[in-house]
Regions:
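Active-site-proximal alpha-helical scaffold in enzymes
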Residues: 77-90, 144-148, 152-155, 161-196, ...
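Acyl-CoA/ACP chain-elongation machinery
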Residues: 186-232, 265-279, 309-316, 333-383
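Beta-strand segments within the central parallel beta-sheet cores of soluble alpha/beta enzyme folds
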Residues: 5, 95-104, 162-166, 187-195, ...
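Condensing-enzyme catalytic core mediating Claisen C-C bond formation in acyl metabolism
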Residues: 3-7, 30-35, 218-295, 304, ...
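Short pre-catalytic strand/loop immediately N-terminal to key active-site residues, enriched for Gly-Thr
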Residues: 134-139, 159-166, 228-232, 334-345, ...
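Conserved beta-ketoacyl condensing-enzyme motif
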Residues: 6, 21-23, 27-165, 195-204, ...
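A glycine- and small-aliphatic-rich helix-loop capping segment at beta-alpha/alpha-beta transitions
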Residues: 20-24, 111-128, 181-184, 204-217, ...
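Glycine-/small-residue-rich "gating" segment that lines the acyl/pantetheine channel
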Residues: 125-135, 176, 180, 196-253, ...
């Protein structure tokens, strides 16, 4: 099997646009959570959101025509890809574009456009839809695979073009799919990761209906509290995280900078319940074990874990239980943290952003903190790197995710060693 490495990254998040701003704020434990006065009229109990401020697509490289054509999620994905391709320093004139694929994932696709379009077309639900008034972009802007398509068009990448849609594990699953495509020799380069822009009334209402959103609104910066005893839900957010994956020889031949190596990937389903989780973490533990075995490492070699850490009561207990099943007493000695304490939960994009955190952690030998951790939960009693990040020599790191529908995924990344 061929080896697969990360050579480019792009980030659009509530704590920064671009890797430099993002990593600085991630290291320092800055919260990107805010209130959104324009949503007050809907009367939602949750009033804290991970909104990407100062996002100006026209200044980042999109034309006005492209902005009109693309939903916010696609703008995120395309511009984040621009960052990642530029960061990779890949010479597009010297590669075989038939050997380059795209898989940019999402959980809920173009809800912003559809929400706004429905309101306009029906006078806020008071009138029937007149087909003659519908935008010619309506279907394309709402398709789950539009972002992957737009990136393929933009760069003339002619390999696989597809979209994972596995909820909150979809970022890792997209990277895992890309890893498998390259490892097995189908492609040499993959653009992968995820984008999400779900802060819309319909999406917020859907999550409120099942009681998953945090109501710790005052102040909003402290609403996301993974593993803390006072947590009561996740903070809905938007973001994009895009990676350029390459076959190792392809990367070395062009002298690419290597952030890290994708070494193992595991994905399972508990086949039990749409939102329910077993508190012992048995199902997530299986995904972690698969990733560790595929990476050919031992549990003792894991230096850091970037946790799913959504901030819901049951998820954080389930995740803690999974670590204890996999690592036993060693679980108490492995530092771990939740990026969502700062960014909120951008659904499908979360685990893509968190895989990039692992790359930057490996490169900088630094583990970011879990902020807003002030009161210990007796059932969540591991080392969550509370409130202040730490330096540590990192060689092997783990990231994982869980999602509605009983999905669990895990990935091992290694520092590249020749």
């Amino acid at each position: 099997m061929r080896r697969v490495v990360v050579t480019g990254i792009g980030l659009i998040t509530p704590i920064g646009i671009g890797k430099e701003e993002f990593w600085k704020n991630n290291k320092e434990g800055k919260s990107g959570i805010c209130d959104m006065p324009e949503l007050e009229k809907f009367g939602f109990e949750s009033k804290a959101y991970g909104y990407v401020k100062n996002f100006k697509p026209e200044q980042l490289g999109l034309t006005l025509r492209e902005i009109r054509r693309m939903d916010r999620i696609t703008q995120f994905g395309v511009l984040c890809t621009d960052q990642a391709v530029k960061d990779s320093k890949i010479d597009l004139s010297k590669i075989d574009k038939n050997r380059v694929g795209v898989n940019i994932a999402n959980a809920v696709a173009g809800t912003k456009f559809m929400d706004e379009e429905f309101s306009v077309l029906t006078n806020n639900g008071k009138e029937v839809v007149n087909p003659e008034d519908i935008s010619p972009y309506a279907y394309a802007r709402s398709m789950p695979n539009t972002t992957s398509n737009e990136v393929s068009y933009r760069y003339d990448f002619n390999g696989t073009c597809c979209t994972m849609a596995t909820g909150c594990t979809t970022g890792i699953d997209s990277i895992g799919f890309a890893y498998d495509q390259i490892r097995c020799g189908e492609l040499d380069v993959m653009i992968c990761g995820a984008a999400e822009a779900p802060i819309t009334p319909i999406t917020i209402a859907a999550f409120e209906a099942i009681g998953t959103l945090s109501t710790n609104n005052n102040p909003p910066e402290k609403a996301s509290r993974p593993f803390d005893d006072t947590r009561n839900g996740f903070v809905l957010a938007e973001a994009a995280g895009i990676l350029v994956l390459e076959e190792l020889g392809h990367a070395l031949n062009r002298g690419a900078h290597i952030y890290g190596e994708i070494a193992g990937y595991g994905s399972v389903n508990n086949a039990m319940h749409m939102t329910g989780l077993k508190p012992d973490g048995e199902d997530l533990s299986r995904a972690i074990k698969i990733a560790i075995e595929e990476a050919n490492v031992t549990p003792f070699e894991i230096d850091y874990i970037n946790a799913h850490g959504s901030g819901t009561k049951q998820n954080d207990i389930n995740e803690t239980g999974a670590y204890k099943k996999v690592f036993g007493e060693l679980a108490y000695k492995i530092p771990m943290s939740s990026t969502k304490s700062m960014t909120g939960h951008p659904l499908g994009a979360a685990s893509a952003v968190e895989a990039i955190v692992c790359c930057l952690a490996l490169e900088n030998n630094f583990m970011p903190p879990t902020i807003n951790y002030n009161k210990k939960d007796a059932l969540c009693d591991l080392d969550y790197i509370p409130n202040c990040g730490r330096e540590k020599n990192l060689n092997v790191v783990l990231t994982n995710a869980s999602g509605f529908g009983g999905l669990h995924a895990a990935m091992i990344l290694k520092k590249y060693i020749d």
